[in-house]
């Protein structure tokens, strides 16, 4: 779920800070983050960090939460967000491209509601040419990443299901094109609908990522257990993909995940991530019993303890 920076601040407090060292190979980076009601400041090696940069440039994180199940169950927006998040962790040029596309779509939709203004058609055409340039790049990157995820997630799921189930991810692009010019032509062909409904009806903001088991949509026909296995294997595929592309291992965060999993899925997850630095949050230590080596810290009222207080 989405949270604001201010939500991290303890009740009855007006600010919070995070101070730590990131080690990557032989290199160390000192990171200090200070968040208050009014501002957020980040320092890396005592130098103020550009807020427009993604902190994931410093190191990769993959988060597992119980809410991940909604990626399967909910609408296509969450599936697009997952793919965009994965691409961003691999390609830091992607975020500004997507941000510019979203801004252009917002402005175009605003223009579509004012069709009587002078030079309307010249303006809408200029928007379409700009949108096509960014949309085609997003389309290419999504298509490439989904193919890799499909391959890796299939392998994990096939193994977990003892060969009984075949997991698939398919990119159902709303507009398919072989060039930005072809993308523009398809937007042009759809313009009549856009004028009628006063909103942009076609584009990468309408893309769908279909997730299937044995060629059936898991959203509609999968059991709760199958859906849970599928999203775990997709996230494992994300971890593997990041390692393959960057050569670096992600830090794994489990946010109260094991309370939702049976022993088989928990063991499978831990087996595949045993060589990764992993941080687990839980409301009790029972879910940590199957972990061979771990350091446990207890948190109560915002304070951290080595032993149960």
Task: Say what each PLM segment does.
Residues 30-32, 210, 296:
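Short, surface-exposed charged micro-motifs
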Residues 16, 59, 165-167, 276, ...:
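A structural micro-motif
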Residues 118-251, 260-264, 268-271, 277, ...:
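Conserved NTPase motor "head" modules and their coupling/switch loops across ABC/AAA+ ATPases, GTPases
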Residues 1-78, 87-90, 94, 150, ...:
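Nucleotide-state sensing region of NTPase/ATPase domains
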Residues 255-257:
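Walker B catalytic acidic pair
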Residues 61-63, 278, 296-298:
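Conserved beta-strand scaffold positions in the cores of enzyme catalytic domains, especially
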């Amino acid at each position: 779920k989405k949270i604001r920076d201010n939500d991290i601040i303890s009740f009855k407090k007006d600010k919070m800070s995070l101070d730590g060292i990131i080690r990557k190979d032989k290199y160390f980076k000192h990171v200090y983050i200070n968040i208050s009601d009014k501002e957020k400041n980040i320092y890396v090696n005592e130098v103020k960090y550009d807020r427009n940069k993604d902190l994931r440039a410093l190191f990769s994180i993959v988060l597992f939460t119980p809410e991940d199940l909604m990626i399967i169950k909910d609408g296509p927006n969450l599936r697009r967000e997952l793919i965009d998040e994965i691409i961003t962790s691999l390609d830091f040029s992607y975020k500004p491209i997507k941000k510019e596309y979203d801004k252009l779509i917002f402005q175009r939709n605003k223009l579509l509601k004012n069709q009587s203004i002078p030079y309307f058609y010249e303006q809408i055409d200029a928007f379409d040419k700009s949108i096509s340039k960014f949309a085609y790049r997003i389309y290419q990157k999504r298509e490439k990443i989904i193919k890799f995820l499909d391959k890796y997630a299939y392998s994990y799921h096939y193994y977990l299901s003892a060969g009984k189930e075949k997991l698939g991810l398919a990119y159902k692009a709303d507009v398919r094109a072989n060039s930005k010019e072809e993308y523009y032509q398809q937007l042009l062909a759809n313009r009549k609908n856009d004028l009628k409904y006063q909103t942009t009806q076609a584009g990468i903001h309408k893309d769908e990522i279909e997730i299937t088991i044995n060629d059936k949509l898991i959203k509609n026909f999968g059991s709760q257990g199958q859906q849970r296995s599928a999203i775990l294997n997709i996230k494992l595929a994300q971890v593997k993909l990041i390692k393959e592309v960057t050569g670096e291992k992600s830090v794994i965060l489990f946010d109260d995940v094991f309370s939702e999993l049976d022993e088989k899925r928990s063991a499978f997850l831990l087996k595949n991530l045993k060589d990764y630095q992993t941080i687990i949050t839980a409301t009790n230590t029972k879910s940590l019993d199957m972990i061979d080596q771990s350091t446990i810290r207890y948190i109560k009222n915002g304070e951290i303890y080595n032993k149960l207080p």
